[in-house]
């Protein structure tokens, strides 16, 4: 499963109402660290395709959701399970850090 883009309008359907845990990458095109973490997020999406959904949301184009979740710096990666935010990772982190965080929420 590839990474899909979500918007303010599709966030509830794609993230909150999803049965799988969802990794949400809050990013913007001008953000250097966001571009650095993007390949890591893509690799995670491939490796965990049967157990999680991975989505990206452009904070410039979708300010409502970014404000709702208090996004102050990007990249911010949030994990949602059963419609609730269960964890947050801020900044461009190594794949190992992101994987170990995700593993806590995969049953």
Curated annotation (Swiss-Prot):
Pfam families: Thioredoxin. GO terms for cellular component: chloroplast. The keyword Disulfide bond applies. The active site is at residues 31, 34. The keyword Electron transport applies. It comes from the Eukaryota. One of its GO terms (molecular function) is protein-disulfide reductase activity. The record marks 32-33 as: Contributes to redox potential value. Disulfide bonds join 31-34. Its main location: plastid. It is found in: Plastid, Chloroplast. The record marks 25 as: Deprotonates C-terminal active site Cys. Residues 2-107 form the Thioredoxin domain. Keywords: Chloroplast, Disulfide bond, Electron transport, Plastid, Redox-active center, Transport. Participates in various redox reactions through the reversible oxidation of its active center dithiol to a disulfide and catalyzes dithiol-disulfide exchange reactions. PANTHER family: GEO12009P1. Belongs to the thioredoxin family. This is Thioredoxin.
């Amino acid at each position: 499963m590839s990474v899909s883009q979500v918007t303010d309008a599709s966030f509830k359907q794609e993230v909150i109402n999803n049965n799988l845990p969802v990794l949400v990458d809050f990013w913007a095109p001008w953000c250097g660290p966001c571009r650095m973490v993007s390949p890591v997020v893509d690799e995670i999406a491939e490796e965990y395709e049967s157990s999680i959904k991975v989505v990206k949301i452009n904070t410039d184009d979708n300010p409502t959701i970014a404000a709702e979740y208090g996004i102050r710096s990007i990249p911010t990666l949030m994990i949602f399970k059963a419609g609730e935010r269960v964890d947050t990772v801020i900044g461009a982190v190594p794949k190992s850090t992101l994987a170990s965080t995700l593993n806590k929420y995969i049953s």
